Amino acid sequence: MLRISSFLCVALSIFSIAADAATASLIEQLTDLSKRFSTAIIYNTSLLAGLTVEPSTQTTLEQTLDLWLTPRQLSWQKTASGIVIFQTATSVPAPAISIPETNNTQVIEEVTVTESLPTPSNGDAYNRNYQQAINYAQQIKSNYVGQSEIAVGAMLNQLPAENLAEALQAVPGISITRDRGEALNINAMGLGAEYQLTLFNGHRLANTENVRNSNQYGQQHRFDIFSAGLFSNIAVYKTTNSSLPSGAVGATVNLLSDDPLAYQDNNLQVMLTTAALEGEQNLQPSFGLTGNAKTADGNLAVMIKMNYENRLQRQFQFETWHWGENGGAPQPYQWPDINKNILVPTDGLALTIENEDRTRATYYGALAWQATERLKLNTLWFRSDTDFSFDEHRISINPQSQSAQAQVNDENNSLNQFVFNAVNAKTSREESNLYYANQTIQVDANWQPSAHLPLTLSPFYSSSKANSKTKEPITRVHVATSPMQADVALQNTSVDNFNFTSNLGLVSSYSHISQMSKRTINVLNEVQEWGIDSHFSAENSWGLQALDIGFLHSTQSYHYARKDISLSPSALEQLPNLDGRWLEPIANQFSAGFMNAEVQPWLIPKSDLLQLYDIDLPFAEMNESDRLNSYKVSFASKEGYISSQWQFEQVTLSTGLRYSNTLSETQGSQLTKTGGVAPINSSNNDSAWLPSVNLKWQPSQYWQWRAGFNRALNRPNYSDLNPKLHVNSGGLPYAELGNPNLQPVIANTSTLSVNWQQQSVSAQLLGFNHHMNNFIVEQAASFNYQGQHYNSLQRTNDGQAQVNGLQASSQWQLPQYSQWFLQSQLSASITHINKADVSTSAGNHFKVEGVSDWTGNLRFLVSDKKWQAAFNINYRSDFLEQRDISNNASSYVEDYTSTDLSFSWFYSANASLRLDMFNATNETLTRTAKTDYASSLMKAEEFGRRVVVSLSLRI
């Protein structure tokens, strides 16, 4: 579906040997034919070796194949992966073609694929056989000139993964960022999620946004809207491709839909799934359906996919929000007789139970029409609807130093034991119902104006819209505890004690309701793109092979609206006294591996007290705070490109140049000098020339060397452009200010790699270096708001950054067979970042946020005809999550290893049963607050193991 010209712009690098004028090698002629018509041609090399043909004067692909193959008892047939050539059986009709599924087949040795990257199609053999999917992906990668990775079929759906981001961990160099135990964003090429770009058939996707709190991801794509098996082909460009939209310094992930016309038969596949969280009895059902149909003449085809999923999650957390050096902490949080460099908590210490109930429905429809031999029309509709319900229970302590004692952990230079004699504590409940929707519509055409001219024109239109909102206002209710003593003791990665002397199960342990508030957030992100791509293939075995020219008009709009309201202090005082009508016990005992002592149950406010007691808390017109937190950002881009590919003996050269001109506009509100709020509109125009040069040298059959230079740009996050004022609600007083004048980050990236590939083993070593100008960094200044002095933090383009690293990967089909299994595959990848440093004009030096020094993935799969078992291990070393330039300590995510297991039983070709276990080791994810001299436990999270059972039926 939607064969986009980005995959047609690179010609195949198969080496040619000159033939005499009368005849030429059939293999050479097929190679030229593949390049001329931009079509994959798959054949057994030994079948065609030594055959020669006369150059064809026919004008169509079909006529040429018939002319060359029929006299030699050869036939051809279109399949999902391209045109397959096979030997005609004597007196027997030609069979339907698929790549053999024999476990020991060496596909790379036997099959030649004349295509640079996968077309948007779905090969059945690659979906069901992991080894063949690996081999096919390796072959495609081998033919591409630049730095890329391919994931097809079984690589995405035969290893355990809860969503598409987790499936993408099979791609060397990609790591993930987790939220609530599930992958949310991807990281690649030594850079965090904000430097990656996700495309759908070569076009930008609108992004859903976090609306549960004030954190905003902006252009960081949230992968929790995609199930793991939704796509069968994914291309990951590790360096820029001139024919694709600009916007990524890191990797560009291109999600490719299926081509309905590629399927030979009508099919219907149903998947029934149930899941359960460890220790829970509630089963979570899921349902999936995939179907395709084609008319008798084979010119019109349709495909539909539908998936419904329910997910229950319970997460146990110890969390703090801010730690700072004692000497710079606010007065209530300073501890006397303690060194000023000792880390102390400047905000709450809390235990939290987070209950999540999520339902996700995904719909996908594609229609393809081969109107004429030279004209094909494609349409696609995709929609994802996700509902989240959160019920969060928390008991927290305000760690003020008055009437309290503390002990210093000399090893970490931080406070780690606290005794609060008259503790300032509260129990809280937050309830939220959130809605995330993404809808994408795409239309394109592939038209060859003349049968005598190898030119293809591909006009396109894409519209993507994402809405993220609170279905009902988020409600927060805080209840203060009565005076009592509390004890807290922390270790580096665990909690020894979090206890209160009074019985928290009694209503008498609580004094009054201290806060009732509501919040609504509505975010609308829209992307529209239209343009045309053109591809010209030259019929030369030397020199120019392909030329691509295109134009893109793209508009992105982002509207963030937030409103807050709280019950006034006077209204809170008028509420009735607390009794059993207001509070109820927590439904689940707090139990986590990082907790070294039993936690007594506590009471929480009853669900939805505002409605239960008719407490009127309506939203009025937007106040100053609402206007400061709401904003609009839009980008309007016009881009054009030209790219070419050249063949010289053992060297293939790909060059490209893209021009981007973008008008950015920001609408918001900003404080005036007199303390009022005034609207502000800002616009900026940026343009950039983005060249790319990639070289591939193949000195022998098994070795390939690649070198490249690319320039790319990365636009600022939407929230950074908002001329906002966000005042921190806890810890040190500081304010965040937006900057609508931010410029895009410009990066020059150079790469060098070597690939070694044999029948059953392949390996790659890649070195890369990013040099980034206009790097966005935070700067601090003094600010006064409503009589309070704040340190203001504002992002500027004052930085320069350099990131370089090495990436090694290997695929190995193990030469071990037994009566128990026929195939075993080991895949491994590791990335080491040697340098990830930022420098500013003021002489400051620090690390790039979101970058781990080490990431790795290990996958092992063993199978027989009737079963398959696999494990997937992913590792990510500690990294700087958020740098703090005020007195607060920076936050780091500690190293984390996730292990997922899978077992499948194939009853028949049409029925299979699968068991997955996610987070098998149930490792705790921890965050640490750090300065140059001290560290302390900041947060610990435990997600629990999840077991999923799936039944797949094909009709």
Q: Over which residues does each language-model region extend?
A:
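Extracytoplasmic beta-strand/coil segments of soluble accessory domains associated
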Residues: 136-141, 145-148, 165-208
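Outer-membrane beta-barrel signature, preferentially recognizing the C-terminal barrel domain
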Residues: 423, 427-430, 436-438, 625, ...
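C-terminal beta-signal and adjacent terminal beta-strands/loops
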Residues: 875-882, 904-955
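N-terminal export/assembly leaders
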Residues: 19-95
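Short, acidic, small-residue-rich periplasmic hinge/interaction motif at the N-terminus
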Residues: 30, 34-37, 89-157
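Outer-membrane beta-barrel translocator/receptor signature
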Residues: 213-220, 229-236, 243-334, 355-363, ...
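Gram-negative outer-membrane beta-barrel transporters
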Residues: 762, 767-772, 776-783, 788-883, ...
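Surface-exposed extracellular loop regions of Gram-negative outer-membrane beta-barrel proteins
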Residues: 204, 209, 557, 701-749, ...
